[in-house]
Amino acid sequence: FQYSNSGKAFLVGAELEVRKNFGFISKQMEDLVFVANMSYIYSRVNLTSVKNNSSDELIRPMQGQSPYIINLGLNYVHPKWGTGASILYNQTGHRLYATGEVGNPAWYEHWRPLLDFQISQKFWKNRGLIRFTISDLIAQKTIFYQNADLGKERQYQKAKDKVVLSQSNFRNYTLQLSFTF
């Protein structure tokens, strides 16, 4: 892979964030909170003016930039007991992993869902905390592919695109114990 800096690039985006507790349903549910954060990002790099450019795409997205990001979550904290729990979902859109050149097209990373769960309990007059986390519950493979349409449709198309790397992902279990003195 070769990297060349471009003199022309453009990026613009919008973000929406929502946070709402469920107290409107009943008083007992006011400690349950829904959170959402969504972003749309449009990025373009123009390589037409780069000398000795061998890229297969002259106008492409910025390397590593997803066109969207979605974060969703449900959080619960019991104020008297010090018990907390959360489930979080994250997804980023497909993104350019490595730029290509003529004869060796760019690699894109296909989006994959991430789902995390966490439960915690305070103790010892709220000075201690034990937390158990399971990260990447879905553990879907990460797929890197070369786009068959060369710049037209960058979304992964299983029937057309060439998978160059399929990487397994695993659940991660964490138990944390902390104290504040």
Model-identified regions with their sequence ranges:
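Gram-negative outer-membrane beta-barrel transporters
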Residues: F1-R95, S178
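C-terminal beta-signal and adjacent terminal beta-strands/loops
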Residues: N90-T99, Q121-F181
